[in-house]
């Protein structure tokens, strides 16, 4: 689909006309038309809900007790001005925004797994659905290329969220519950580490058995 108001419309249309074949079936076209009737309203709602969730979760990134270490979304990105320059124009039936996709990054894979399993939303690799979807992105997309993905800045401990049309306060409540589960897992691990350090000191070992590499690389997200 080409936007006739864009400067390269005529050039692109000429190129596409030379290779275009109409392969749209009648029932597909009917479904597309039905889905398009409230597209702008749905998109506006998803934009608004996503912004609300990101803004609500953002303070946790700087909280040392939180399992959340980073949050990725164009609205809060250092390069947000580049995105704002290309936002769709506001109209009576549409409020521009930054889309329904954002990414959470956690301390490590285990804590990301605890959050993922506790988050009461649909789980899946798609995006743009009418229901909120959650996906352990690197675990599913780059399962056999994790080292390469890490070199490109994609950490194993990220969870991608595609926001749907649910009530935004209900969604935020679900995120709070899941984050609380992960925070408890983090606190329990710290407590266990202190106990092990204490036991080790008393037995003369002089060091804790809990290390940064303590089996976390073996943790996998549950299916």
Label each region the model flagged.
Residues 1-101, 105-139:
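Active-site C-terminal subdomain of aminotransferase-like
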Residues 133-223:
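PLP-dependent enzyme catalytic core of the Aspartate aminotransferase-like
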